[in-house]
UniProtKB/Swiss-Prot annotation:
Similarity section: Belongs to the G-protein coupled receptor 1 family.
Phosphothreonine: residues carrying this PTM: T345
Natural source organism: Rattus norvegicus (Rat)
Gene3D superfamilies to which the protein is assigned, alphabetical: Rhodopsin 7-helix transmembrane proteins
Post-translational modification comment from the UniProt entry: This protein is not N-glycosylated which is unusual for G-protein-coupled receptors.
Quaternary structure annotation from Swiss-Prot or TrEMBL: Found in a ternary complex with CX3CL1 and ITGAV:ITGB3 or ITGA4:ITGB1.
Name of the protein in question: CX3C chemokine receptor 1
Single GO MF descriptor: cytokine receptor activity
Amino acid sequence: MPTSFPELDLENFEYDDSAEACYLGDIVAFGTIFLSIFYSLVFTFGLVGNLLVVLALTNSRKSKSITDIYLLNLALSDLLFVATLPFWTHYLISHEGLHNAMCKLTTAFFFIGFFGGIFFITVISIDRYLAIVLAANSMNNRTVQHGVTISLGVWAAAILVASPQFMFTKRKDNECLGDYPEVLQEIWPVLRNSEVNILGFVLPLLIMSFCYFRIVRTLFSCKNRKKARAIRLILLVVVVFFLFWTPYNIVIFLETLKFYNFFPSCGMKRDLRWALSVTETVAFSHCCLNPFIYAFAGEKFRRYLRHLYNKCLAVLCGRPVHAGFSTESQRSRQDSILSSLTHYTSEGEGSLLL
């Protein structure tokens, strides 16, 4: 499986320049069993949770905000990422490589979803900065039309940045891995890892840190409770993302150093492979966490889930569902009144999930 970043091969031994064998069979066996179970769980929860987010955003009759556009695309990125996990599970269990076209396509979806999720979380942070810190100057520019245009640009950027990760991927020796030209054999894996560390972690972290530092400073001077509640949700999404991806990026950086023989001993190589397996499980689970964050911190999303549950229960029991719609409409009118009282906080605070 082309995980980030060294490909996950199924070989039981790793050889250094002196042809000394390092046994990794027990780690490979652990990965085959544990990762297969873990991928199945992440796929199930990630699919259901992110589909609920998509339904909540697309089925609402209320007008959308630019924040909703970004949250919708974040959920779609997570769905694209999680959709590849059944194929990697099959690959781990059967030890059979995917068809060449499916190998390249699945790897492409994996990395496009990976970078797309990171980029949209970064864009959401920038949007929060504009909505809170530069509210007066950015109000006219934070429209749904602008959100759609920016989202298309983000998807294009994700495809462009992901292309080095899958352009050389093919089925080789019954495995799905990178088959690089001889001139790129040594440098291309290093460039791939560096791209993930820099564009997928360091640069977004710097941007988000700046945006949220300025946002926190602004919130200290503004006691608008509605605005603080909106920031709590978005900030929670960002913090959880980096808590789950930081260990993996550290291991990827160490894997890059391994190409330059920084870890010559077999024990260090084994520790690094164990760390890769463990941090990978933590990192990949991020794609099913955002819906739970919405349910925990987003009042409107919890309300939508209750409404959906009551509607399904009413259909199963043969009861009418008008009461639920009436209550929802009443609350929507209350939200509209609150929005009119706090209109200066800009359009972004009117997200359907916040």
